Amino acid sequence: MEGYRLKEYSCFTSAGACFILSVVYVASLYVWNSPHNRDHPSTIKKRFFSVFIMMFVSPLFLYYFSQEHILQKATLWQLLGLRLHGLLPAIVIPMFLTMVLFLGPLSMQGFSGLWKLYAGIKNVWISGVNIFNIIFEAEPMYWMSNLTNLIWLRNHVVAPLSEEFTFRACMLPLLLQCFRPMTAVFVCPLFFGVAHFHHMVERMRNGLDFKRALMISCFQFSYTTLFGAYSAFLFAKTD
């Protein structure tokens, strides 16, 4: 595949590749001529297929626009962050750091007992005394119902995985070969945030006026960009 790689390279090329990849990712969601909204099962299934294809297309951008000396030092899998060496700390440390950031909601769910719904723990009481817990007995249908819920799968599985893979794993290595690490960390999420403006079209179709739809989209851009910077920082530090 060496003959299909870009020979000349610049920072503009890196940023341009990320921009094009963002456009292609969003465009893949709208290639289907569907009269239904984004939450309709047929629309969700079609978009699942689109992002599945993008999981194969996105690494091609990374390979084609990567500098030759970088690919000589690391494989494409390693650039994507998929490697065995250091994988465990790369998973555990960011997970605990993220848990610290969400310590408030986690504490509230812990005190209220709501976490038992997710863990499937049932208290067994005898004469008013909690004797022991039974695992996976409280609400077994909670996870089963969610795994068959297309909207839940989209919001919690498919969208996060495909977005992180495309906007982090495939874009950040391109920017890191040109920009300083911290610069790349803050530039990369801009593509991620801007990509969410396509939801503005859906909101206007649902009857929301332009000004209101724009305000909501700008707010969404703010928090998705902020989260994207945090995610990009974790990726850069654990790569």
Regions found by a protein language model. Name each.
Residues 1-160, 173-177, 236:
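Specific transmembrane helices
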Residues 26, 145, 149-239:
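Transmembrane helix-loop-helix hairpins at the membrane interface
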